[in-house]
Amino acid sequence: MSSYIMLVLLLLDIYSSCVDGYLSSPHVGQDPPYLAQQKSVMSSPVALTASSASPVVTDNYVSKCPSGGLCSKLPADCIICALHHNCSYGRPHNYTCRPRAGVHCVSDQGERQQNFTLSLLCRFCFQLDASQYRCSNSSDCMTVSCPRRRYNASCEVLEHVHCLGKRVFQKRLFCNWTGGYKWSTALALSITLGGFGADRFYLGQWREGLGKLFSFGGLGIWTLIDVLLIGVGYVGPADGSLYI
């Protein structure tokens, strides 16, 4: 009887040790490796981002391109042309073009075209007329100076204009910006209230304005000189801008 009890206790001890070992295992409560791998692939944000962003990258130009219009009237971003420089400057030359993916256009007869011929003048983008591109403005340069100063502007060709080379280019332009000062207002203030320095204060030249104010316009001499200088445009705004 005692041996039977000892055998039962031994079996219970072995069973309890097995249960404790299983419960303390690091794999309890976790998915099998293949299930965990499948979950990580299905819920990966990288995979979803790539698949959802790819059509946006390829179709971002489609909204700018009219559908069903003439192929020859499409903007430059909507077509792909086999451009080359083997042409005479200023003369028209024919180039073979095709609409980009997702863009549909027709010929003059209303038939859909995959390839068409586009006639362009042989000239680079930086050789276009100033009305055919837009350039950045600069308010950091003096417009009233001798010789006239220039600044480096970034220019971009208009959408409907076709040309050779890069559509974004750098160009040296004259400083030509205004701060809102009117020449007529400055001249009127110089004639009427120039003795109190009102013209100089209006142009932002407060030091000269204080000098005229406390000297009563230089006893009239400074006032007459300022009328002449403002009248011919020699004296301008203190920020270096042009008159309106």
Curated annotation (Swiss-Prot):
Cellular component GO terms held in the UniProt record: membrane
InterPro entries per the UniProt record, alphabetical: TM2, TM2D1-3-like
Residue ranges crossing the lipid bilayer per the database entry: 177-197, 213-233
Glycosylation sites: N86, N94, N115, N137, N152, N176
Domain of life: Eukaryota
A Pfam family of this chain: TM2
Leader peptide range in chain numbering: 1-21
Subcellular location: Membrane
Ranges per topology, Extracellular: 22-176, 234-244
Protein name, UniProt field: TM2 domain-containing protein 3
Source organism of this protein record: Danio rerio
Name of the coding gene: tm2d3
